[in-house]
């Protein structure tokens, strides 16, 4: 089975449970868990090392996160370990966050520009994206000087490229085919 499909199934199961219990709390704990694993090499070593037994992994993870994570998230982590799916944790967390955003009617827009946008430009862009999508928009901004000017926006798999660099590329292509 593909990694994405496995992560989707586990994320969906946890999401359905979280909706019944406490979506915001479980999402925050899952992100905290991922952050801890990413930032702490010892925790990552224990979680991912193939020669540490499953029971040792579960015991150590339960001790490390006893006061930090709810029983629901600790049980979910134990399930991943039991089924040898802990390597999917990061992807599961990413899919879970996407499901939570969908439930809250939030869409993420990645906005790249050559220079930082002014507050007025950000507000106008935010309003226009909300109007276009019919959803609440969370903008993730990135400054990329190589774009020369303009803005590139990505929402899901849709890209709107209004950058000077893109327009120059199109001019080059049309001149080379002329």
From Swiss-Prot:
Keywords: ATP synthesis, Cell membrane, CF(1), Hydrogen ion transport, Ion transport, Membrane, Transport. It comes from the Bacteria. It is a peripheral membrane protein. InterPro entries: ATP_synth_OSCP/delta_N_sf, ATPase_OSCP/dsu. Its main location: membrane. Gene3D superfamilies: N-terminal domain of the delta subunit of the F1F0-ATP synthase (1.10.520.20). GO terms for molecular function: proton-transporting ATP synthase activity, rotational mechanism. It is found in: Cell membrane. GO terms for cellular component: plasma membrane; proton-transporting ATP synthase complex. NCBIfam families: ATP_synt_delta, PRK05758.2-2, PRK05758.2-4. Belongs to the ATPase delta chain family. F(1)F(0) ATP synthase produces ATP from ADP in the presence of a proton or sodium gradient. F-type ATPases consist of two structural domains, F(1) containing the extramembraneous catalytic core and F(0) containing the membrane proton channel, linked together by a central stalk and a peripheral stalk. During catalysis, ATP synthesis in the catalytic domain of F(1) is coupled via a rotary mechanism of the central stalk subunits to proton translocation. This protein is part of the stalk that links CF(0) to CF(1). It either transmits conformational changes from CF(0) to CF(1) or is implicated in proton conduction. F-type ATPases have 2 components, F(1) - the catalytic core - and F(0) - the membrane proton channel. F(1) has five subunits: alpha(3), beta(3), gamma(1), delta(1), epsilon(1). F(0) has three main subunits: a(1), b(2) and c(10-14). The alpha and beta chains form an alternating ring which encloses part of the gamma chain. F(1) is attached to F(0) by a central stalk formed by the gamma and epsilon chains, while a peripheral stalk is formed by the delta and b chains. This is ATP synthase subunit delta. The gene is atpH.
